[in-house]
Amino acid sequence: MRLIATILITMTLSGCATVDTIKKYWPRAHDPVMFDHLVELDRILESVDCNKPDWGDDWNLMQMGSAHLARYTEWRRDPQAENIKGLYAHTVRMSKGGSQKFCELGIKTAAQRINAAKLAWEGR
């Protein structure tokens, strides 16, 4: 009984802070527009060709799409906003070009970020 009382008192005293923390990471309702942009980014990523000498141009499309999605998730206060901002920063770095190996690693990193958002958003 004392344990239950202690838990209730703790929850009452920390009330607002706990609720705000939970709300920050609680999944938002499904947004088909946001998911559509994520699908489009995945399609663009599949078309990036690291064998081309100017593969940085392929990343410019990714950069524009991820910038749009980053702003959208930020304004919506979606829990995936930080991940999508990271994807945008990654595409900015990749659009500057580099070696073929750098491009291939960049594709893997971008795919992981896209997959993380997909897993978080699917089923909502």
Predicted regions: what is each one?
Residues 51-124:
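Intrinsically disordered, glycine/charged-rich N-terminal periplasmic/extracytoplasmic linker segments
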Residues 19-51:
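Immediate post-signal-peptide N-terminus of mature secreted/exported proteins
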Residues 1-4:
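Positively charged n-region of N-terminal signal peptides that target proteins for export
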